[in-house]
């Protein structure tokens, strides 16, 4: 599979699991591995993050029925999690640093979230921090509405309860 080299396309920031640099579109992705070197990494740790970046880079080819005519985008991908278990506190700290050091990016994708439903009476701490980061940095987060792990889950999970984010499912 071949796609043209990037030229003047805008860059979207991705904060997710790891990225596999061996994929056909890797020329379009500037990858930063933020996971501690002492944490073991398995091949499965690269699957989700790579899939997210693939849709941003080559979505029209991978999902032609969803082609919106916007074309391809370059990606600056920050791998912040390996494995299914990660600390939301640690991820939020990393997000703050990543945003502060990448002021040129205005649109950020975050597909990491909880499979547990949000509380009916207040927004999550993670969502509140994302809202604060967006307001302070004039950016927008595109946040996954959370995958539905089973039929009993009806509501979104954190941080998809962010008020200022664009939430997609």
Regions from the PLM with identified roles:
Residues 2-32, 39-88, 138, 162-165:
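Subtilisin-like serine protease catalytic core
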Residues 23-29, 35-37, 118-122, 152-154:
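A short acidic (Asp/Glu
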Residues 1, 36, 111-112:
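A generic structural motif
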Residues 81-165:
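Substrate-binding/access-modulating region of protease and related hydrolase catalytic domains
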């Amino acid at each position: 599979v071949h796609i043209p080299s990037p030229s003047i396309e805008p860059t979207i920031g991705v904060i997710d699991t790891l990225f596999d640099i061996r994929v056909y579109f890797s020329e379009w992705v500037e990858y930063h591995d933020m996971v501690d070197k002492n944490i073991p990494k398995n091949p499965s740790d690269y699957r989700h993050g790579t899939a997210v970046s693939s849709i941003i880079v080559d979505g029209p080819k991978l999902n032609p029925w969803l082609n919106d005519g916007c074309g391809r985008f370059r990606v600056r991908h920050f791998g912040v999690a390996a494995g299914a278990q990660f600390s939301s506190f640690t991820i939020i700290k990393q997000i703050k640093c990543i945003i502060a050091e990448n002021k040129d990016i205005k649109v950020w994708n975050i597909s990491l979230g909880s499979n547990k439903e949000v509380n009916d009476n207040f927004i999550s701490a993670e969502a509140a921090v994302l809202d604060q980061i967006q307001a302070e940095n004039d950016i927008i987060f595109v946040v996954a509405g959370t995958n539905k792990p089973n039929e009993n889950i009806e509501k979104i999970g954190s941080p998809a309860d962010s008020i200022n984010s664009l939430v997609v499912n």
